[in-house]
């Protein structure tokens, strides 16, 4: 059965049958080509119809496989030469066949039209988005400019406040003399002199601070005086006058090397010491019951490692130990900056004692079974303070602050750690005075003769 031919109708957007064409168009075509013959369908035409069916809209009936009408006349096959010479095909008498290229071109035109519409919509959306982004950018740009202006204003205000604070601090410390014109003011000359001379108030504050510190030091020294195990540190005058004997390195060693927790070490104390011990015990009980821990201050009168270790591990007479305060209160008991600074310095020394006790071989100490007691570790650090050091090129008798500096700046060496005192040092100030005297002697003119003995230069001149 021959398939019915369909033509693309542009007005309705689909394919229509040739039977629906108007009669005027058919008659016009018949009058135009009266001598043409019917042409048989070639395989090439069939393949073109198949290609056209692939581009058909889904849901429509394929015209190549549509059942044919019984009234339609069959297509009469003719010779090949006639199909080659005739450009136009006819189906039945007086009916013109449309080529598949025309339908395919119409389909492409429709698709291109739809793509152009989509492109136009996309262009409109892009332009709208562009306008929105411009508005968003302008709005944020205004906010940023306003924020930068506010920041500049805040910076200027803070700079002005800093300048004011500098002036106030300078006036309070006396670095900047405050100028006030008292002309025409109702003030007394004494008040004007007091206001015009800020150094007076500064000196009064310094003297008051010194008196407070001295009172605090005296109180701490009295606490240390209640313990007969504590030996006072020799003063600078003892070294200058030669009253301090360097051979007394092992004096009172039995008292100092007793265990820190041995109560029998004070058995030779007199009755007054016993009374002090009783008072200390009562104070200890009262302090433990009260809230002494939160108001405790480190003893400023401590001058050696032994007393510092006793304060940390055991506690001074009538006072709790720093170790118990750390375990109970943490860092809340040292509230002021001075206490925190002093505690840091003391803990540097205490940690070195603990480290030596835990691993003595790390510091070159050869001991049986690599074990050392706490008292021996304290003695090692105390020997470093007394002279087993090379603090700035000399064997110095270090203070607690200098010992902290010696450890914190890692100036110590392995040969410094020893249970025996190799060499007793002198205070740092003695070496500084000797160096100063040596410089002054070199700077003196050689022409001035000595009253006792003549110099070689003077002998040559004479």
From Swiss-Prot:
Biased composition (Polar residues): 197-214, 252-282, 441-455
Quaternary context: Homodimer. Interacts with SLX5.
Positions of crosslink type Glycyl lysine isopeptide (Lys-Gly) (interchain with G-Cter in SUMO): 231
Pfam family, one: GCR1_C
Deleted gene: phenotype: Prevents ub-hotspot formation and exacerbates heat sensitivity of cells deficient in Rpd3L histone deacetylase complex members. Leads to the up-regulation of the expression of the Rpd3S complex subunit RCO1 of the Rpd3S complex and down-regulation of HSP12 and SIR2.
GO molecular function, one term: DNA-binding transcription factor activity, RNA polymerase II-specific
Chain positions covered by the region annotation Disordered: 11-43, 66-97, 190-214, 226-289, 441-462
Listed GO biological process terms: positive regulation of ribosomal protein gene transcription by RNA polymerase II; protein-containing complex localization
Chief place where the protein resides: nucleus
Biased composition (Acidic residues): 240-251
Coiled-coil intervals, chain numbering: 105-135
Note: Present with 238 molecules/cell in log phase SD medium.
Residues covered by region (Homodimerization region): 81-140
Annotated region described as GCR1 DNA-binding region, given as residue ranges: 296-385
Record remark on domains: The coiled-coil motif is required for homodimerization.
Protein name per UniProt: Transcription factor-like protein EUC1
Keywords on record: Chromosome, Coiled coil, DNA-binding, Isopeptide bond, Phosphoprotein, Ubl conjugation
Transcription regulation found in the keyword field: no
Subcellular location: Chromosome
Post-translational modification: Sumoylated at Lys-231 and subsequently ubiquitinated by the SUMO-targeted ubiquitin ligase (STUbL) complex SLX5/SLX8.
Modified residues (Phosphothreonine): 254
Species of the source: Saccharomyces cerevisiae (strain ATCC 204508 / S288c)
Compositionally biased tracts (Basic and acidic residues): 26-35
GO cellular component terms, A-Z: chromatin; cytoplasm; nucleus
């Amino acid at each position: 059965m021959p398939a019915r031919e369909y033509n693309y109708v542009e007005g309705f957007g689909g394919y229509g049958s040739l039977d629906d064409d108007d009669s005027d168009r058919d008659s016009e075509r018949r009058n135009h080509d009266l001598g043409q013959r019917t042409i048989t369908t070639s395989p090439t035409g069939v393949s073109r119809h198949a290609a056209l069916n692939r581009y058909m809209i889904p849901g429509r009936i394929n015209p190549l496989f549509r059942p044919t009408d019984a009234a339609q006349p069959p297509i009469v096959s003719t010779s090949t030469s006639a199909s080659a010479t005739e450009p136009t095909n006819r189906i039945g008498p007086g009916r013109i066949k449309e080529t598949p290229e025309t339908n395919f071109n119409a389909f492409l035109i429709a698709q291109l039209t739809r793509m152009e519409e989509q492109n136009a919509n996309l262009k409109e959306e892009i332009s709208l988005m562009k306008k929105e982004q411009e508005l968003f950018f302008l709005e944020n740009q205004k906010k940023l400019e306003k924020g930068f202006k506010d920041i500049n204003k805040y910076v200027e205000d803070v700079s002005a406040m800093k300048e004011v604070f500098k002036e106030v601090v300078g006036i309070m410390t006396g670095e900047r003399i405050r100028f006030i014109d008292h002309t025409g003011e109702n003030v007394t000359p004494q008040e004007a002199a007091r206001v015009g001379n800020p150094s007076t108030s500064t000196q009064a504050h310094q003297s008051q601070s010194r008196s407070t510190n001295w009172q605090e030091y005296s109180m701490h020294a009295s606490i240390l005086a209640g313990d007969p195990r504590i030996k006072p540190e020799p003063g600078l005058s003892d070294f200058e006058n030669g009253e301090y004997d360097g051979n007394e390195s092992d004096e009172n060693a039995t008292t100092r090397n007793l265990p820190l927790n041995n109560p029998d070490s004070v058995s030779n104390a007199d009755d007054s010491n016993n009374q002090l011990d009783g008072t200390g015990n009562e104070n200890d009980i009262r302090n433990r019951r009260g809230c002494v821990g939160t108001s405790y201050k480190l003893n400023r009168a401590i001058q050696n490692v032994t007393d510092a270790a006793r304060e940390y591990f055991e506690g001074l007479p009538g006072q709790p130990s720093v170790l118990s305060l750390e375990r109970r209160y943490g860092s809340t008991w040292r509230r002021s900056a001075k206490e925190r600074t002093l505690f840091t310095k003391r803990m540097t020394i205490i940690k070195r004692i603990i480290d030596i006790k835990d691993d003595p071989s790390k510091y070159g100490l050869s001991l049986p079974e690599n074990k050392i007691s706490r008292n021996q570790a304290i003695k090692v650090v105390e020997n470093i303070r007394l002279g087993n050091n090379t603090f700035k090129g000399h064997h110095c008798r270090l203070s607690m602050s200098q010992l902290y500096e010696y450890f914190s700046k890692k100036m110590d060496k392995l040969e410094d750690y020893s249970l025996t005192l190799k060499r007793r040092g002198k205070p740092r100030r003695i070496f500084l005075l000797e160096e100063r005297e040596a410089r002054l002697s070199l700077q003196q003119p050689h022409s001035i003769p000595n009253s006792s003995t003549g110099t070689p230069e003077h002998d040559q001149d004479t």
